[in-house]
Structures are given as structure tokens and as C-alpha cells.
């Protein structure tokens, strides 16, 4: 089984590993380079003045790599800073320019993340660039289902994580049941060896909520990941 989003190897057969990450890359793993939105918060260490150029060089030197985890965040601060917006837009533009897939973060502001993608899609369409169109993995998506059709139109996928195991997360569990089968993925979002959720347990819970079998959900995860990575 593949872990669609994590920050270190979790024991799955294959991983989509995002920065910031620790440990080594395993055979078959896909790495995503990018600056997390929390790095743009006032209390974070200042970024190098060459951070964007450094990111570009790393991506060019690793043709199989994607861009992520990037995005916007209103979990830590109610207002999104200009530096966070500019940092997200710069990295998203780079993904479009190089034709790389993207892992997205959008805590409490998914609508704004979707709006940014749509804006750039129009800009790059006008430039008539014959580049591969990025796919987008909406990691930890937890907004109402009303945004899901727009995500699907953007060539987006939604990954379901450990929150589905929380019996008290009623709204999230209802959302998981509504995600179209063709864009559903599974993730642990593991950041350390102490907090690795069981991908099998997540698959079992998702299967229960969707009235199907864990094996069917696992097969769906693998086929959808193939589609996500093939764009």
C-alpha cells in the first residue's frame, strides 16, 4: 500500500514524502520539495534570500520530484500574511512552470487555495505553454463537500488521514463518505516515528464509512495514486 502523504517513511510499500522530512528515501518513494506555509509565520526562522532559486534547482536536478507541502494556513494565525501568500504563489507558479505535481496545505482556507490554482491555470493557459498539467493532492482537506466538485475539475485528489479514526469528528467522517471514488487517497501525515498512524486502520475506517471493503479502498488508493502521478 502507498502512503499518499507523510514526512518520513512509515512502513508502507511506497511513500509520497513531503518536506520537511527526515530519513532516507526508499526505492519507489516520490519526494516533494517545498516550503511549508508555517515557515512564513513571524515566529519562524527567516528563510534564505535564495530559497526560491534553491527550490528551483533542486526540482530541476530531481525530475521525478513534486512540489510540496505548500499552501496557506489560518490555523496558526487568523490572518494570512503577505509573505505567506507570495511564498505560496511563487511555489505554485514554479510547479506550473516545470509541470510538477503538488501537495497542498490549506487549513481553514481551502477556498483561497482553490482560487489561487484557478488563477494560475488561466495565466498559464494564456501563455499557451505545452507543459504537463500538474495534479493536486489536497492533504488533510476538511471543508464542506461543496468545494469537492471544483477540486475534481482542477485535477485534484483528496487524501484522508488519521482524523477519520476519531469518532467525535462527525463532520469529517461525513465528508469522507462523500468524496468521489476517483479522487480518494489515503495518508498518515506522519511527522515522527512516535505519531505514525496505521494506514490499514485508516483504510478499514474509510471502507466502513463508505459501505465497502478495506481491500476495495486499498485498490482505489493505488489506482488513484497512479493517475495522480501520471499527469
Description of each model-found segment:
Residues 1-231:
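Mid-domain alpha/beta scaffold segments of enzyme catalytic cores
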Amino acid at each position: 500500500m502507498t502512503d499518499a502523504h507523510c514526512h518520513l517513511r512509515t512502513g508502507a510499500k511506497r511513500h509520497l514524502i513531503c518536506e520537511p522530512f527526515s530519513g532516507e528515501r526508499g526505492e519507489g518513494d516520490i519526494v516533494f520539495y517545498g516550503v511549508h506555509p508555517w515557515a512564513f509565520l513571524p515566529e519562524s526562522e527567516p528563510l534564505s534570500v535564495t530559497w526560491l532559486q534553491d527550490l528551483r534547482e533542486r526540482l530541476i536536478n530531481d525530475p521525478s520530484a513534486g512540489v510540496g507541502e505548500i499552501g496557506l494556513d489560518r490555523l496558526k494565525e487568523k490572518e494570512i500574511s503577505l509573505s505567506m501568500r507570495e511564498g505560496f504563489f511563487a511555489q505554485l507558479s514554479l510547479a506550473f512552470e516545470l509541470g510538477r505535481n503538488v501537495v497542498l496545505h490549506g487549513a481553514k482556507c481551502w477556498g483561497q487555495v482553490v482560487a489561487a490554482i484557478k488563477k494560475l491555470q488561466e495565466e498559464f493557459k494564456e501563455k499557451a505553454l505545452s507543459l504537463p498539467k500538474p495534479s493536486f493532492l489536497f492533504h488533510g482537506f476538511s471543508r464542506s463537500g461543496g468545494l469537492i466538485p471544483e477540486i475534481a475539475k482542477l485535477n485534484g485528489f483528496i487524501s484522508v488521514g488519521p482524523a477519520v479514526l476519531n469518532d467525535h469528528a462527525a463532520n469529517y467522517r461525513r465528508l469522507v463518505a462523500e468524496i468521489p471514488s476517483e479522487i480518494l487517497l489515503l495518508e498518515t501525515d506522519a511527522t515522527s516515528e512516535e505519531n505514525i498512524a496505521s494506514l490499514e486502520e485508516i483504510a478499514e475506517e474509510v471502507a466502513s464509512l463508505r459501505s465497502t471493503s478495506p481491500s476495495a479502498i486499498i485498490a482505489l488508493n493505488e489506482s488513484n495514486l497512479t493517475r495522480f502521478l501520471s499527469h
